[in-house]
Amino acid sequence: MSDRPTARRWGKCGPLCTRENIMVAFKGVWTQAFWKAVTAEFLAMLIFVLLSLGSTINWGGTEKPLPVDMVLISLCFGLSIATMVQCFGHISGGHINPAVTVAMVCTRKISIAKSVFYIAAQCLGAIIGAGILYLVTPPSVVGGLGVTMVHGNLTAGHGLLVELIITFQLVFTIFASCDSKRTDVTGSIALAIGFSVAIGHLFAINYTGASMNPARSFGPAVIMGNWENHWIYWVGPIIGAVLAGGLYEYVFCPDVEFKRRFKEAFSKAAQQTKGSYMEVEDNRSQVETDDLILKPGVVHVIDVDRGEEKKGKDQSGEVLSSV
């Protein structure tokens, strides 16, 4: 077979797919600090899932289940994430959530290459954390192992919207609390994020299980093999996170450099639009002038002897207008 089709296929992207360009795209990946950050995300997610999912175990078993303690679960999730952010924030940024990582990519805070490793580490940590919890919990009380599920009286669309909303408030809290441009933040950033997670749980546990974190739902789903409506816990949180990050970073509190670039782009576009508008107006004015010059007037029939216009009928019987 000829190598020509292969050459054609790679001809245009060949210069971009060189070893040097690939190394530039993954710049910073091959450093010790990078792998420390990835390991931190893995370990933080493992501990977070293990501790927080443990609060969902119903120790009454299937025969005599205890009432669900929403406050206990909410506080455990909130304080767990606050602790992990405080411990690992200076190492990896303390994302501990694929939705947060995607929002950071969309706001140009981390590279795509770094985000791929972060999300992989987070998902792997969630699986291992859920697996450890499954191993140390008596089979009679394992139950669903904290698998997130949409309430039976709600549709998938309702669940998607709830996850979008609670993740939006979480990620908006993260961006607002971690904004380096602010000088009024004096409290604990980790605690603010933890409270945001707790509030989301207090509101949405009965609706969707209050995930706000695709990896948190992914871990127990893998261990228990339960994938019912699992896509909701990826699509909803990611959309909510991207909306929150984009609104905060580009609308409410844009940085000085972004505002300068936006003004330049807007001014340039306005000038181009104004020039096109003036050109169209000039053409229209010329056409209207030509119409005034070339348009024939109305012929009037006037009786000079009587000094008045004739009103009557011509030979064809049509009325001659004096207007």
UniProtKB/Swiss-Prot annotation:
The modification Phosphothreonine is found at residue 289. Keywords: Cell membrane, Cell projection, Disease variant, Endosome, Glycoprotein, Lipoprotein, Membrane, Palmitate, Phosphoprotein, Repeat, Transmembrane, Transmembrane helix, Transport. Changing residue 215 to T: In MLC4; likely pathogenic; loss of function in cell volume regulation; does not localize to the cell membrane. Glycans are attached at residues 153, 206. Residues 94-101, 209-222 dip into the membrane without crossing it. A motif (NPA 2) lies at residues 213-215. The modification Phosphoserine is found at residues 111, 180, 276, 285, 321. It is found in: Cell membrane; Basolateral cell membrane; Endosome membrane; Cell membrane, Sarcolemma. GO terms for biological process: cellular response to type II interferon; cerebrospinal fluid circulation; intracellular water homeostasis; multicellular organismal-level water homeostasis; protein homotetramerization; renal water homeostasis; water transport. One of its GO terms (molecular function) is water channel activity. It is a multi-pass membrane protein. Residues 1-36, 90-93, 102-115, 177-184, 253-323 are cytoplasmic. It catalyses: H2O(in) = H2O(out). A motif (NPA 1) lies at residues 97-99. The keyword Heme does not apply. One of its GO terms (cellular component) is cytoplasm. Residues 58-69, 137-155, 206-208, 223-231 are extracellular. The chain crosses the membrane at residues 37-57, 70-89, 116-136, 156-176, 185-205, 232-252. It is linked to Megalencephalic leukoencephalopathy with subcortical cysts 4, remitting: An autosomal recessive disorder characterized by macrocephaly apparent in infancy, developmental delay, delayed walking, variable cognitive decline, behavioral abnormalities, and early-onset seizures. Brain imaging shows swelling of the cerebral white matter and subcortical cysts in the anterior temporal region. The severity of neurologic dysfunction and brain abnormalities tends to improve with time, indicating a remitting disease course. NCBIfam families: MIP. Homotetramer. The tetramers can form oligomeric arrays in membranes. The size of the oligomers differs between tissues and is smaller in skeletal muscle than in brain. Interaction between AQP4 oligomeric arrays in close-by cells can contribute to cell-cell adhesion. Part of a complex containing MLC1, TRPV4, HEPACAM and ATP1B1. This is Aquaporin-4. It comes from Homo sapiens. The lineage of its organism: Eukaryota, Metazoa, Chordata, Craniata, Vertebrata. The gene is AQP4.
